[in-house]
Amino acid sequence: MFFSKKLQKFNNIKHCFFSRKDGFSKGDYESLNCGLGSDDKKENVLKNLELVSKKIGCKKESLITLNQKHTNEVICFNSDTDVKSKLTGDAIVSKVKNIGIGILTADCASIFFYDPKNKIVGCAHAGWKGALNGIIENTVKKFNE
């Protein structure tokens, strides 16, 4: 697990960047695979998601990930009723408290955003296609809407 010193100074958010270590998956997906869309055993992925949820202090049911497709699409959650998992997109922006948002990466970059004034968090999956097509810019725009 890795933490940003800059983000740790904010007491009202928890964050963490995970590597592939210390999970339950075996073989090609060893070890901390959190991709439900992968060919990994579902029981191992669910155990990995439970582990991640505990580490960041949220319920597994409140950990939101996306069906990432290397796009520039940003999913926004402005209220509890908006929150759904496995929507298609490559970034999440949220004003909703007490949920976890997650981006899954292999060789792409994960980017975490935080606006302490407006209490908005976001994360983006930035592969070369998404970066070239504006995933970072689109995520920042959602913070300003």
Task: Describe the predicted segments one by one.
Residues 1-145:
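Active-site microenvironment for binding and transforming phosphate-containing groups
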